[in-house]
């Protein structure tokens, strides 16, 4: 399984291209986010306005939109045309491509978001890679740590792969989507255009262009009072 099967690094993130090989497993990219950021020139970004707390190395493209309140703990890199909404919290080793929306109260850490990613309403994105055009509904959690804190494995049709990672949230291929209040357990992998419906708790692999959903039945009974 190669990263090239899930996404292609967009033009907006070409300064990082040498650090993210399309030939390796996509979760291997998580190990190089910090290294890739250390190699960048953080000059030339827009001035951080009052109300936005910034610490460490932070680059925000001049065309990106900053809110009146946000917290950016570097290293953080925000690409052109991206919109950050009030209360978002980017805390270390975060790369965001062009024309994304990072929602109010969104929390991101050690993650790479490519172009046109939409995470507009209270998501948690930890140790994850989101491909071009990926979308998370309100309240989605990309959980990145097992309860027993053991290394995380990926369950694929070909077998179980030990990633060696203690923290690993999810891989979302290009245009993959996750519905409101769904939880992806550590090591979840979604192929391009895969879709997880609202409130699902998911582990493992969802093939490309496949819908993962749970069938439920709602029963109606008369009140007795």
Annotated model-derived regions:
Residues 42-44, 60-62, 173:
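Conserved short histidine dyad/triad with adjacent acidic residue
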Residues 60-105:
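Glycine-rich active-site/cofactor-binding loop and its immediate structural neighborhood
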Residues 45-46, 64, 82, 115-116:
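Short Cys/His-rich Zn2+-coordinating modules
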Residues 57-59, 77, 95, 129, ...:
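Residue-level "contact hotspot" at macromolecular interaction interfaces
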Residues 18, 113, 119-225:
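Glycine-rich hexapeptide-repeat left-handed beta-helix
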Residues 1-56, 193, 199, 208-210, ...:
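Terminal amphipathic alpha-helical/low-complexity segments used for targeting or macromolecular assembly
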């Amino acid at each position: 399984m190669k990263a090239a099967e899930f996404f292609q690094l967009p033009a907006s993130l070409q300064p990082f291209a040498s650090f993210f090989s399309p030939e390796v497993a996509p979760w291997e990219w998580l190990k190089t986010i910090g290294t890739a950021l250390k190699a960048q020139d953080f000059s030339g970004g827009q001035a951080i306005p009052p109300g936005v707390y910034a610490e460490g190395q932070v680059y925000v493209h001049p065309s990106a939109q900053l809110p009146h309140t946000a917290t950016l703990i570097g290293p953080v890199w925000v690409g052109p045309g991206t919109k950050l909404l009030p209360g978002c919290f980017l805390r270390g080793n975060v790369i965001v491509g062009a024309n994304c929306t990072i929602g109010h109260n969104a929390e991101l850490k050690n993650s790479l978001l490519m172009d046109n990613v939409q995470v507009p309403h209270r998501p948690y994105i930890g140790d994850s890679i989101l491909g071009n055009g990926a979308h998370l509904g309100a309240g989605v959690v990309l959980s990145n740590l097992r309860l027993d804190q053991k290394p995380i494995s990926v369950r694929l049709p070909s077998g179980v792969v030990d990633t060696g990672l203690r923290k690993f949230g999810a891989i979302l291929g290009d245009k993959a989507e996750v519905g409101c209040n769904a939880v992806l357990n550590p090591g979840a992998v979604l192929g391009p255009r895969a879709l997880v419906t609202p409130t699902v708790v998911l582990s493992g692999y969802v093939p490309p262009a496949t819908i993962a959903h749970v069938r439920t039945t709602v029963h109606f009974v008369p009140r007795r009072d």
